[in-house]
């Protein structure tokens, strides 16, 4: 199979990496399901500059609630209509400004990239990320994805090309989208640490880019959402599907997709009015206390925040919309952490577990039902709220397929 880094264009990053150029492997095989993680970091491999585990945890902190006993749902998830077989009719595309978008027919080739990082030997070590990858890999096998068309990067492997360093990760992302055609079905799954970095382009309402954190992040840097979008979304043709799942902290807008959906199926609007209301109330209290300067500063800050938030949303819609059919499920909002949990005695990411539980029980759900069901599974144990976003407006009553 074509392999990450073999030929083709490579996105150049300011953080280094993104190249590749290593040859296709001989006898490449994925570990079996009876694997046991090594007691420490894999031995005998080197990443750029000679990788050694850092002494401090990755930025963004350790995913919360580690070791929490998270049992599978005891009964059916959601209302009875979730078990209804939906007809996946041929949906029509539309226009975003002057750009045409199309839903994928899902009849073309299938490719998947699965990344799980436990950060063995680091202070921020996680336990469930590699398990997440194995579980998602099995899920995809049952849905027509072949092992020869799946690349797995985990930090329990001995082959240097299969270690989730920054260079290997970005090269694998290029492999995923290389040669994509209308009707193709691509799948990306990341389970690991997530973080935030100061934004400079004015496209983030909170002023921060969301990041994912490679194994060698201290030497090679984090991977920001702008770069993820540039590699995996921008090159896709009209009508090509990319389904992405990010089970990591601060992952709400990890692909910088412009349309984020509520559980009722509507596009979310930034909560500007609520923020403005609170700011005006504070200014009024300052006025009542005779603090005219405080009142003026409060009003200026309030309306600046409102302007920046709506401005960031407009920039995102103008620069991040795509004719491709890109859908992302993230484990939490940008401001939240995503839990590393325990399910039936095995470590797993809470979001990955919830998604697989829902999809295995109800293979035919609409987008709206899927989002609600995943949230329902998590709601009784965690505060994190999974987010669903897309590159173009989607009909949330359509059948969700991968």
UniProtKB/Swiss-Prot annotation:
Q: Which Pfam families match?
A: Peptidase_C14
Q: Which InterPro entries match?
A: Caspase-like_dom_sf, Metacaspase, Pept_C14_caspase
The UniProt GO MF terms for this protein read:
cysteine-type endopeptidase activity
What family does the database annotate? Belongs to the peptidase C14B family.
Q: Which GO terms describe its biological process?
A: apoptotic process; proteolysis
Q: Which residues form the active site?
A: 193, 249
Q: Name one GO cellular component term.
A: cytoplasm
Source lineage: Eukaryota, Fungi, Dikarya, Basidiomycota, Ustilaginomycotina
Q: Where is this region: Disordered?
A: 1-79
Q: What is its EC number?
A: 3.4.22.-
> Which residue ranges have biased composition labelled Low complexity?
23-45
Q: What does this protein do?
A: Involved in cell death (apoptosis).
Q: What keywords would UniProt list here?
A: Apoptosis, Hydrolase, Protease, Thiol protease, Zymogen
SUPFAM superfamilies from the UniProt entry: Caspase-like
Identify the domain of life: Eukaryota
Name recorded for this polypeptide: Metacaspase-1
